[in-house]
Amino acid sequence: TENSGVYKLDKNKTLTHPIEKGNITNIYQDSSKELWIGSWEYGLYHIDSEGIIHNMRHDPSNPNSVSSDFVRDCCEDNNGNIWIGTFNGLNRYQKSNGRFDVYTAGHETESLTHSSIWCIVKDAQGTLWLGTYFGGVNYFNPEYEIYTRYKASDTERDGLSSSIIGRMIEDKDGNLWICTEGGGVNVYYRKEGTFRWLRHEEGRNSISHNNVKAIYYDEKGERMWFGTHLGGLNKLDLRTNRFTHYRMKEDDPHSLPSDIIRDITPFHDQLIVGTQNGVCLFDPETETCQQLFKDTREGQAIKMVADLFVDRDSTLWIAATGEGVYSYRFDTDKLINYRHDSTIPNDVDNHTNSISNNNVNSIMQDSQGNLWFSTSGSGLDLYHKETDSFENFDMQKNGLSSDCIYEIHESSFKKSCLLLITNQGFSQFDVPNRKFHNYSIENGFPLTAVNENALYITRDGEVFLGGVQGMISFHEKALFFTPKSYNILLSRLIVNGKEITPDDETGILQYSLSYTPEITLQANQNMFSIEYTTSNYIPANRDKILYCLEGFSNEWNSVQRGQNFITYTNLNPGTYTFIVKTQREDIKAVRLKIHILPPWYETWWAYLIYVVFTGSLLLYLIQVYKSRIRLRESLKYEQKHIEDLESLNQSKLRFFTNISHEFRTPLTLIVG
């Protein structure tokens, strides 16, 4: 009721009054048949399966209570959580722990546009649609909220000290140590969900520089080692919480060769340190440094080190920017350089003796002993030790999103799978099938830019990725979801630059384009665009869209990123079928038959006129021809007749001449 709470009328028509006060705004029954009742001013009522009524009110001292006593709507998601729209925020109630998680409007693009929620509706895909008081409509799907975000904060306990994240490592207690650019080192206490910052403080025992590029955890010695940019090497004694700094000294050959440290990796009881000026072997006990390879021609080319790795055979691999990869054996003092050589062809197995690019970002050895190299511009290389050859995987051959790979790790969840970060996001590589699956902002990946080396997998399988907008984490298992079904719709038709609407002056559409199976266009309407859309609003559920115009071309074309208009121009008259589909067989393709009429001079009645006119002309010409033939024959006959008469006259004349001659001769004789 509006002011008297809730009344209950049972099967026996007995009326009771279980909730006696409150302006009731909403009654919702969840999948467990439990009731959730929203009220204005008296919070949320929950009637459980036993019929017990629980009144949940806002408690300013409890951050896990409902955010407001003014509740407008309730809805259950597909995970069994109850979402409550209130005057001051959206609340998620988890039955398992009885706590409320509150979401309010913020400056971030992924936050609510307004905190006052009026209504909540769940669609067939499980997406929740929120009507706000002054922020329009918001939507999201809780099933696909698999990423946890960590952002820079002004408060140490609540977030990162810097939004630019680098290398990470886990300690024995499961805490994550994070290198940042400009914010020192952050420690994330995963169990508590809190942070601690280790930043440079002038005049105090602290890290020497806030731009930290390398990290190594010595569990046995209970020490953390940090490599900084311009601050040299730092040791943190975890027992005393004190820092020791190691810097380059011009007059000391046993000091660091540079204060710019790029990577640190252990070797027996020593540390191999990669710097901006080569590689050195650092002894933590004597605190002295021995620079490697400085006396060899090959070694002098090693300057800017991108990554270091010691494989299971104790071979040191060095990624040197612009110089390819080096392998070094300490026992034999043998240094080998692997460089790119474009003149060396690939064999039948796509193997070559040349690495694909001289700029290698990271090196990794998987559980099978395979060595992998990520490059800046040529994708991923696999080193085959038995043949001393490389196999390359890239965008063109294998579907990688970008050929610039920053870091590689082996999956802890899926066998024979690699995880990679690129300058386009995050990718999984199925090694047996030689195929990549890519994640980017288009399919729900939350980071627009991933940083170098900022990929780490914890012992319990949680994946952490860092970028220039903070850090995210997720579990690989969450990436393998059952795709949701949806529909493809044709939404708009534009002909010769003008949008066509039902029953307009063109007469092309009588109904909405989505409900129109075929259209007819005039001859001068052969330039048109068709807009498509889908009922899918889940980024992670997006599929590749393909289209084809049968009658024009049977080739399937893929839709480019951000494109939802498909245009055709100067089509010949005829009948075509426009088809839009996805690569998934369970999504029904949409079809539109298009008839383009010919111009009037190509219509059937025009051709009939042409035939009649041509036939009549032919008949006329035939008649004229026949008349001329008859006239010619008549003239010939007359001519022949005249000639015959002339011949007859001549014959008569000759006859009479001869007769007269015959008669005249005797008479002449008689007269004579």
Question: What would you call each of these model-derived segments?
Answer:
Residues 3-6, 41-44, 88-91, 133-137, ...:
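Loop/turn residues immediately N-terminal
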Residues 230, 622-638:
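Cytoplasmic juxtamembrane amphipathic helix immediately C-terminal to a transmembrane segment
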Residues 29-32, 76-79, 122-125, 170-173, ...:
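Residue-level detector of Asp-centered blade-edge/turn motifs that repeat once per structural unit
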Residues 634-672:
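Primarily the dimerization/phosphotransfer
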Residues 35-36, 81-83, 127-130, 175-177, ...:
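Conserved beta-propeller blade signature
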Residues 10-13, 48-51, 94-98, 141-145, ...:
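Short loop/turn segments that connect beta-strands within beta-propeller blades
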Residues 19-25, 54, 58-71, 101-118, ...:
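Residue-level "micro-hotspots" composed of small/polar
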